[in-house]
A protein has these predicted regions:
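Domain-edge interaction signal
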Residues: 1-117
Length: 117
């Protein structure tokens, strides 16, 4: 199982600089799709339903106060297995071109968010 820090590092390595808000949503969708496609969690870190969408608090504690982020020094891109990279790649390819706001709006329409709030 990957560490959430490795997932964040991998996403930033693939997509480059992005808002911390967008990074949080891409990590969230990576976890969601791992549960669906691979029938197991990608990482064990907790995800919470915050006002602007899902947030992984352990990631937030490292980027708090930043708007844009370009690398994740606490993780390693090589910390993911081939299967984990394939799952994250599919998520990043689909959701990566979307804006942070679009991703946040989408999460607010889905059952996990509605049930958590």
């Amino acid at each position: 199982m990957a560490r959430v820090h490795d997932v964040a590092a991998y996403i930033l390595g693939e997509r480059g600089s992005m808002t911390t808000w967008k990074l949080q949503k891409l990590v969230y969708y990576s976890q969601a799709w791992s549960l669906v496609w691979d029938d197991k969690p990608l990482f064990q870190a907790r995800i919470e339903a915050w006002a602007n969408g899902p947030v992984v608090p352990v990631l937030y504690s490292h980027h708090r106060g930043a708007y844009q982020i370009s690398h994740w020094p606490n993780g390693s891109r090589s910390g993911l297995t081939t299967k984990e990279r394939e799952t994250v790649d599919a998520v990043v390819n689909f959701y990566g071109p979307k804006t942070s706001q679009w991703l946040s709006d989408l999460t607010h329409l889905e059952a996990p968010w509605i049930n958590a709030r």
